[in-house]
């Protein structure tokens, strides 16, 4: 019988499956997601595997609830790091985790406190799966919504303008379903508290709005610092806690 672990980080709910300590048939992964959905509410399923990159300690495969693969999930990375250290999958206080398109370096600073280092990010349209001809704005119910694109291992669109909070899930879905992004996008809505603090809500690709999004926090901080709206480090507040992003 397949053993699974439920974990939570800042309100994000995860199913964690250790495919290092037990055998998991890759062909069965879609069925595993369906069976887990019958029993649990979760945002992503995290599958820990032996690495294929010789420099990595472990590999992480991230499934959204719709069965699609996500390139990155920093809160998921943090959860997997805690699991890996607790279950002695790694022997040091640091971990190099292989993701879909990048590597994440995690350092254990305290018992359940982790620092995640991501080096690969880009503001280029091509890196964000946007056609070069696309405008960085779209219409929603007669209002023009502007956004800033950034890729942090996965594509994000960051909105800084004032938005009706009740409309955020609809506006995020509208951009995801538009022809601007070819493969969907995570949409972050920023409310600036002060120069080094923001409140953030994120409508995630393949999931919908979640209580937190680690890669969304990085995307928002990067765009804010780039445009002179924020200073680094930036405190990013979610409904159930915060992360600190140093750009």
Give, region by region, the residue ranges found by the protein language model.
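A glycine-rich beta-to-alpha transition motif near the start of alpha/beta enzyme domains, typified by
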Residues: 1-110, 157-247
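Flexible, glycine/proline-enriched loop segments at strand-loop-helix junctions
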Residues: 70, 119-120, 126, 160
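Short, solvent-exposed secondary-structure boundary/capping segments
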Residues: 112-119
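Beta-strand scaffold of nucleotide-dependent catalytic cores
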Residues: 116, 148, 213
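Proline-rich low-complexity regions
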Residues: 121-122, 129, 155, 182
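Active-site glycine-rich loop that binds ribose-phosphate moieties when present
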Residues: 122-146, 168
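Internal active-site segments that recognize and position negatively charged phosphoryl groups
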Residues: 137-164
């Amino acid at each position: 019988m397949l053993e699974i672990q439920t974990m939570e980080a800042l309100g994000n709910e995860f199913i964690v499956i250790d495919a290092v300590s037990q055998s998991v048939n890759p062909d069965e992964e879609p069925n595993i997601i369906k069976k887990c959905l019958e029993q649990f509410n979760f945002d992503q399923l995290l599958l820990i595997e032996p690495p294929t990159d010789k420099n990595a300690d472990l590999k992480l495969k991230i499934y959204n609830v719709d069965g699609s693969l996500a390139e990155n999930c920093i809160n998921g990375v943090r959860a997997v790091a805690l699991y890996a250290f607790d279950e002695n999958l790694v022997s040091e206080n640091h971990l190099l985790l292989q993701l879909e398109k990048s590597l994440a370096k995690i350092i254990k600073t305290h018992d359940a406190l982790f620092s995640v280092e991501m080096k690969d990010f880009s503001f280029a349209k091509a890196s964000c799966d946007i056609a070069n001809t696309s405008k960085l704005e779209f219409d929603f119910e007669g209002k023009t919504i502007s956004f800033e694109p950034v890729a942090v291992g996965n594509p994000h669109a960051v909105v800084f303008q004032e938005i009706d909070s009740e409309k955020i899930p609809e506006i995020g879905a509208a951009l995801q379903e538009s022809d601007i992004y070819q493969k969907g996008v995570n949409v972050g809505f920023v409310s600036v508290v002060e120069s080094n603090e923001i409140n953030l809500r994120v409508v995630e690709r393949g999931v919908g709005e979640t209580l937190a999004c680690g890669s969304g926090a990085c995307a928002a901080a990067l765009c804010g610092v780039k445009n002179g709206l924020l200073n680094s480090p930036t405190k990013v507040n979610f409904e159930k806690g915060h992360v600190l992003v140093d750009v």
